[in-house]
């Protein structure tokens, strides 16, 4: 399976990466907030759903503080995933405080052949060194601040080390894909770098992603092979 992913999706297999597992979303959020506050260069966040409420406000407060000291912050979210969670002026509000913000596949009522092509990723990258991913979005219900569907149970992981490079690439590919001006981004490479880190854990890590912008079914094939 790992060879298939590397061959078809070009996501390499890494070592030299420490992994922290969160059995509850709120534990992931708490650690995420701590790491966001330490950012020195850039923060990339890509999520299916963002809710302009308590959980996000904790994150936004830190993002605004990091922007003030020169950290580059980019937010990317799926429009349909965030319907009912945020207002239409969300992008403008983020830009006003220095946070770059883009939307994937804005919802337009009527016939739309790509209506179901959604971005379900949940990714945070901090300085290209630390990354978070998992099953939780940035909405109150995922952290049990609210309970519209009962007690929510989800998981997440924190990566530190070489494998974070794949999360960085995954974010930038989607970020650049929705804007013509970034189709050939000359600065893409400056976010992909090696740094002096010695992991305490051993093993292999292979972050990978399927894209809503093509007809490839790599994610499906991986799960079928596992089953």
Descriptions of predicted regions:
Residues 1-227:
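Charged, low-complexity intrinsically disordered terminal segments
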């Amino acid at each position: 399976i790992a060879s298939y992913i590397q061959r078809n999706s070009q996501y390499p297999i890494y070592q030299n990466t420490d992994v922290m597992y969160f059995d509850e979303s709120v534990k992931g959020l708490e650690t995420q907030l701590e790491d966001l506050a330490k950012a020195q260069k850039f923060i990339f966040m890509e999520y299916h759903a963002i809710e302009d409420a308590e959980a996000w406000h904790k994150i936004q407060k830190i993002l605004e503080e990091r922007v003030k000291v020169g950290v580059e912050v980019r937010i990317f979210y799926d429009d349909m995933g965030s319907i009912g969670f945020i207002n239409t002026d969300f992008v403008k509000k983020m830009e006003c405080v220095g946070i770059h913000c883009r939307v994937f596949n804005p919802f337009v009522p009527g016939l739309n052949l790509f209506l179901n092509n959604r971005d379900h990723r949940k990714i945070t990258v901090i300085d290209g060194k630390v990354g978070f991913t998992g099953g939780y979005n940035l909405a109150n219900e995922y952290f049990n601040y609210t309970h519209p569907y009962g007690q929510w149970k989800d998981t997440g992981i924190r990566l530190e080390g070489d494998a974070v490079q794949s999360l960085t690439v995954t974010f930038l590919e989607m970020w650049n894909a929705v804007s013509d001006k970034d189709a050939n981004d000359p600065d893409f490479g400056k976010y992909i770098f090696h740094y002096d880190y010695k992991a305490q854990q051993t093993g292999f890590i292979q972050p990978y992603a399927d894209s809503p912008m093509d007809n490839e079914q790599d994610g499906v094939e991986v799960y079928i092979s596992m089953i």
